């Protein structure tokens, strides 16, 4: 499923050889993607990977996969709520490229899964096929942008942090299971921000010094802090002033309000 696909797509890209995808479980959205998330020298990185010439997904196989794997695929898709909100807010603040066509494709995948949750859980063949189709669509969305922006936001960043094991030990959880946790953490925080905006108590301030101390304590002991700083240079937050962010709060509010309620996602 996901891990084997990522490794295969990465090797295919490195050696410039064709790649055919045969997913045996509807567990992640990386089957048709052109990027792969790999742990490299202690760091989690999105690396170039080969997109498949063909995807052969047999319902008789992936539809009978362990339900835990299927649930992980559902969670990977539901995480797009956060990814798309992140992208829209970033575009609002920094004029980052934002493609409505890609967003519509990813939203279509989201709706396809959301509207068939009970049927997917029951293992109904048609619903399981829709889940697989949604996962492939999400991979195509990444192909269209050339990166993982439409499919990966704060919810995946949390997963990558956990995968690096700088704050925690090894987690015996599937990628999609960790995405579900990351989605809930991000959603709860977003709703807190929306509530503060609504009550006019939302204050924007910088945590640069506190962030530096945290990064040193968390990543310094792993010996990857310098590499992480180099990977993330220049500092993108330097493009956004606290005044600019404060002024944008009224426009950010409806983006957050469009996210599902925390109780619905639970």
Segments from the language model and where they lie:
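Short, well-ordered alpha-helical packing segments
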Residues: 9-12, 75-78, 180, 184
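A glycine/threonine-rich phosphate-anchoring loop and its flanking beta-alpha core
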Residues: 13-112
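Short, electropositive, low-hydrophobicity segments enriched in small/polar residues
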Residues: 4-6, 27, 34, 180
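N-terminal small/polar loop signature for handling phosphorylated ligands or for N-terminal nucleophile
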Residues: 1-20, 119-131
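Generic hydrophobic alpha-helical membrane-span motif
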Residues: 8, 29, 64, 161-162
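Glycine-centered flexibility sites
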Residues: 1-2, 30, 73-75, 139, ...
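Active-site segments that bind and position negatively charged phosphate/pyrophosphate groups
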Residues: 105-265
């Amino acid at each position: 499923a996901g891990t084997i696909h990522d490794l295969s797509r990465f090797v295919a890209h490195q050696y410039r050889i064709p790649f055919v995808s045969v997913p045996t479980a509807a567990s992640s959205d990386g089957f048709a993607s052109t990027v792969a998330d790999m742990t490299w020298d202690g760091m989690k990185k999105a690396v170039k990977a080969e997109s498949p010439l063909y995807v052969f997904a047999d319902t008789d196989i992936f539809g009978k996969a362990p339900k835990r794997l299927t649930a992980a695929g559902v969670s990977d898709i539901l995480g797009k709520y956060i990814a798309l909100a992140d992208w829209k807010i970033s575009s609002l603040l920094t004029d980052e490229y934002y493609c409505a066509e890609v967003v519509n494709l990813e939203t279509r995948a989201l709706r396809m899964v959301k509207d068939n949750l009970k049927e997917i859980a029951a293992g109904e063949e048609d619903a399981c096929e829709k889940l697989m189709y949604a996962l492939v669509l999400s991979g195509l969305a990444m192909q269209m942008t050339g990166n993982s922006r439409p499919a990966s936001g704060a919810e995946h960043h949390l997963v990558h942090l956990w995968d690096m094991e700088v704050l925690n030990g090894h987690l015996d959880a599937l990628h999609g299971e960790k995405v579900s946790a990351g989605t809930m953490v991000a959603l709860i925080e977003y709703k807190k921000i929306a509530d503060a905006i609504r009550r006019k108590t939302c204050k924007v301030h910088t945590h640069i010094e506190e962030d530096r101390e945290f990064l040193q304590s968390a990543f310094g002991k792993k010996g990857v802090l310098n590499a992480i700083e180099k990977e993330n240079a220049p500092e993108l937050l330097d493009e956004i002033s606290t005044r600019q962010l404060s002024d944008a709060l009224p426009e950010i509010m409806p983006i957050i309000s469009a996210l599902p309620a925390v109780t619905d996602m639970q």
